[in-house]
Amino acid sequence: MAIGIQDQYFGTEIEMTGITRQRAAEKVAELFGTRAVCDGGYYGVWSVTDQEGKKWKFMYDGSIYTERRERGRMVPAGREYSTEMVSPKLSYGEMGKLQEVVRCLRHYGAKVNASCGQHVHVDASNHTPRSLKNAMTIMYSKEDILFKALKVQTSREQEYCQKVRPIVLEKIRRMPNSTIPWKVETGMVWGRDGSHDHYDDTRYYA
């Protein structure tokens, strides 16, 4: 059975500056009618829980060129202005909520510059082994068009948004359908599983 877009869960990470992580969390908490919590740690995390009990995080990212507004212009800023918003797992029906959060952040000063990017992670739990094969094949065949349409910078294509590796695609194409979920989950396709590490290399492929 084909998987429709309305059945697809996703999460996103949006990099921004112009607003501190604390202020971003506080303003989104106001939007949700909840409160912001300082989780701290190396990434200086602030978190907010929405009305459905899902946690949104605002954390430091070293790749962001930080700026703040001063007297109507943008000037260099400290690391507190490095803000990466990490959404929880969202359903298609929650797209409006994500849009509200983004509008809220923009209203209170969030902006992007050439150093900022966005990652979208697609949940594979509703996929079958065959649909995963098909999805990767389609993505591989349309990558050049997608990269051009999204205006992906050459620098990001070489580092943070690399194209699908043909060798990985070929491995998956050759696998029996029954083994794909286990081999993807355990990292056998990628060589290792570092997918839960914030800066692991396996995360930076389209």
Question: Model features per residue range: what roles?
Answer:
Residues 1-111, 125-206:
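C-terminal accessory/tail domains of diverse enzymes
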Residues 113-115:
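Active-site histidine-anchored catalytic micro-motif
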Residues 120:
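Conserved, mostly hydrophobic/aromatic
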